[in-house]
Amino acid sequence: MADPIFFKPSRELTIGDVADFTGASLRDPKLAPRSVERLASLKDAGEGALVFVEGKKNVSSLVGLKAAGVLCTESLADSVPSGIAVLVSRHPHRDFSAVGRMLFPASVRPESWLGETGISPAAFIHPTAQIEDGATVEAGAVIGSGVTIGAGTLIAATAVIGQNCQIGRNSYIAPGVSVQCAFIGNNVSLHPGVRIGQDGFGYVPGAAGLDKVPQLGRVIIQDNVEIGANTTVDRGSLDDTVIGEGTKIDNLVQIAHNVRIGRFCLVAAHCGISGSCVIGDQTMLGGRVGLADHLIIGSRVQVAAASGVMNDIPDGERWGGIPARPIKQWFRDIANIRSIGQSRKDASSDE
C-alpha cells in the first residue's frame, strides 16, 4: 500500500484516466468516471483500489475480489467479478507500473530526502565546482574542486563527490554515496551507500610482500543506469570500468576494475564480477552469480542464480551451476547425480 505519509499522489485519477494513459480497453465505458484512490496488490485490494492480474494460474485470486478496477489480459477478463471496471491490456504489470510511476513519481526517484530544494548553506561546495541551475545539493553533502553537476540532479545529504567528477542532468545521488574518478551520465540513480571509483584490488609480489598496483583508470556510467544500495564499482587499473546505458544493478554487487558491462543488462544482488570481465548487451545475471576474471560473456545471456562462471559464454545462451555450463547440460548432470544416488540407495536396501 502506498502510505500517503511517504508517497503523495501527484494527481486525482479515474478509471478513464487509466485507460487513456495505458491504452487499455475499458470493457464498460460507463465506469470511466470512477475514482481510483490507491494502487494495491490482489490480497490488499478493496473499494477504490486499482489492481492487476496476469496469467491463468492467478484466476483464483479474482474470486470475491473487491476493487475499483482491474488491469488484466483478455483471457482473464470474464473472470473478474461484476461491478469492477475491467481494463484489458496485453501487458497488465507493465501498464500498472506505468500508472504507479505517473501517480507516485517520488517512488522511483526521490525528489529530496530532507524536503528541500536548491543549494543548502550546510553543504560544502568547493568554489571551483560548477552546478547548473535547478540542481539540489542537500545539507552535509561534499562537492570537491572542479566537479560539474547538471540541472535537475539531486545530491542528497552526506554524499561525497570527489574532485573533477562529472554528473549529468536529472540524476540522483543518495545519502552516503561516494564518487571519485568517475563520469556519470544523465538520469542515473545511485542508491544509499553506493561506492563509485575507489581503487581496484590489484597487487603484485614484491621484495617484502605484496606491492599495490596503481589504479589509474576511471569509471564511466552511461545514461539511465540504476545502481542499488551498497554496491561497489571499482575504477580501472589502466582501462576504464564502464557500465552501459540502461543497465540496472541490484544491491550488494561487487564490480571490479576494468569490467565493461553492456547496455540494458540486469545484475541481481550479491553478484561478484571479477576484474576485466566483458559483458554484452541485454544479459541477465541471477542473484549470487560469480564471474572469474577476464571472461567474455556475450549479449542476451542468462546465468542462473548462485552459478560460478569459469569460462566464456557465447551470445544468447543460458548457463547455470558450479562450475557453470549450458543449462540443459546442467539439468542432465543434476538428473544423473540423483539417479546415481537413488541407485546406490536401492542397492544398499537390497543387501
From Swiss-Prot:
This is UDP-3-O-acylglucosamine N-acyltransferase. GO terms for cellular component: membrane. Belongs to the transferase hexapeptide repeat family. LpxD subfamily. Pathway: Bacterial outer membrane biogenesis; LPS lipid A biosynthesis. It holds the Pfam family Hexapep. One of its GO terms (biological process) is lipid A biosynthetic process. Keywords: Acyltransferase, Lipid A biosynthesis, Lipid biosynthesis, Lipid metabolism, Repeat, Transferase. GO terms for molecular function: N-acyltransferase activity. It is an enzyme of class 2 (transferase). Gene3D superfamilies: Hexapeptide repeat proteins, MurE/MurF, N-terminal domain. Catalyzes the N-acylation of UDP-3-O-acylglucosamine using 3-hydroxyacyl-ACP as the acyl donor. Is involved in the biosynthesis of lipid A, a phosphorylated glycolipid that anchors the lipopolysaccharide to the outer membrane of the cell. Homotrimer. The active site is at 257 (proton acceptor). The keyword Repressor does not apply. It comes from the Bacteria. NCBIfam families: lipid_A_lpxD (TIGR01853), PRK00892.1 (NF002060). The keyword Repeat applies. Its EC number is 2.3.1.191. CDD domains: LbH_LpxD. PROSITE patterns: HEXAPEP_TRANSFERASES. It catalyses: a UDP-3-O-[(3R)-3-hydroxyacyl]-alpha-D-glucosamine + a (3R)-hydroxyacyl-[ACP] = a UDP-2-N,3-O-bis[(3R)-3-hydroxyacyl]-alpha-D-glucosamine + holo-[ACP] + H(+).
